[in-house]
């Protein structure tokens, strides 16, 4: 079975991203998966300047596009691979992590971690309760709301896809045409509560709307640094919100000490 790990690392270089992507590349080699790290923008998704609620700076500072939608370019590789794992550039993988592709059995379309399943601080739990209501309460998708955890949205920093099941939902479209579907325009343009949204909201909406067979993966595959209370047990550590990390994520010696 042909397997690919796909990452996107465009824009300014960072010690954090260098460290994390190095760990992912080494992991791919260890489990026998191919590895691609996209370092130049390919899709260059830009909101409609006549309708967008996003600031001009949000895309012009990156050269006139939104880099948050670049990783969907991984969908173009289903012609060669049976399984694809898409991993954000701010995720560090331990050298003891098992093979993630074994976690997504053949019957599933898509796998990711429901963020609320992670053991977390009370402060972060309150934050995602508010976030999930803001992002998802107005969307007409069939899922259950929990008073303690909100909507069960998945953190899309880590996704695993089975070609045989997942690819059909793309309807033969290129990654660019997929992202530019009319149904996603409200997310791309950042309308209403989605002004600062990333591909995470779009993808959560889409996989639920399509009623995909979703594997809710164990939290250890995508544990959020500073939010997870058992971070040292995680296989994959997600250093999200880089600018709020010690020294904006550049003090990797401290980060390594915190998680190892």
Predicted feature locations:
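N-terminal anchoring/stem segment of glycosyltransferases
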Residues: 1-59, 66-70, 79-80, 194, ...
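Conserved beta-strand termini and adjacent loop/short-helix elements that scaffold enzyme active sites
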Residues: 8, 38-40, 113, 217-220
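Short, charged, surface-exposed secondary-structure boundary motifs
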Residues: 18, 119-125, 246-250
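Non-transmembrane alpha-helical segments in soluble domains
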Residues: 25, 102, 204-208
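A glycosyltransferase accessory/donor-loop signature
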Residues: 46-52, 93, 145-155, 163-260
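A conserved donor-nucleotide-binding helix/loop in the catalytic core
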Residues: 48-87, 93-102, 110-113, 154, ...
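Conserved donor-nucleotide/metal-binding helix-loop-beta segment in metal-dependent transferases, i.e.
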Residues: 93-135
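Short, flexible, basic/aromatic active-site loop/helix in glycosyltransferases
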Residues: 132-150
């Amino acid at each position: 079975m042909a397997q690919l790990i796909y990452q996107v690392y465009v824009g300014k270089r960072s010690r954090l991203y260098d460290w994390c992507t190095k760990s992912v590349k080494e992991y791919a080699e260890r489990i026998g998966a191919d590895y691609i790290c996209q370092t130049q923008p390919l899709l260059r998704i830009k909101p409609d300047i006549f309708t967008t609620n996003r600031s001009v700076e949000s895309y012009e500072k990156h050269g006139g596009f939104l880099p948050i939608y670049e990783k969907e370019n991984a969908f173009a590789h289903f012609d060669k691979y049976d399984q694809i794992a898409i991993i954000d550039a701010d995720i560090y993988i331990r050298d003891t992590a098992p093979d993630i592709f074994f976690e997504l059995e053949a019957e599933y379309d898509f796998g990711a971690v429901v963020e609320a399943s992670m053991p977390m601080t009370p402060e972060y739990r309150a934050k995602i309760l508010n976030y999930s209501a803001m992002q998802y309460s107005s969307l007409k998708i069939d899922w259950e709301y929990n008073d303690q955890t909100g909507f069960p949205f998945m953190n899309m920093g880590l996704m695993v896809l089975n070609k045989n099941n997942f690819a059909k939902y793309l309807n033969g479209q290129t990654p660019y045409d997929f992202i530019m579907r009319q149904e996603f325009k409200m997310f791309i343009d950042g309308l209403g509560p989605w002004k600062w949204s990333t591909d995470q909201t779009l993808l959560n909406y889409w996989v639920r709307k399509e009623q995909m067979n979703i594997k809710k993966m164990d939290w250890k595959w995508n544990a959020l640094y500073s939010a997870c209370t058992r971070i040292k047990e995680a296989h994959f550590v997600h250093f999200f919100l880089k600018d709020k990390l010690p020294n904006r994520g550049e003090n990797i010696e401290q980060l390594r000490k915190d998680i190892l």
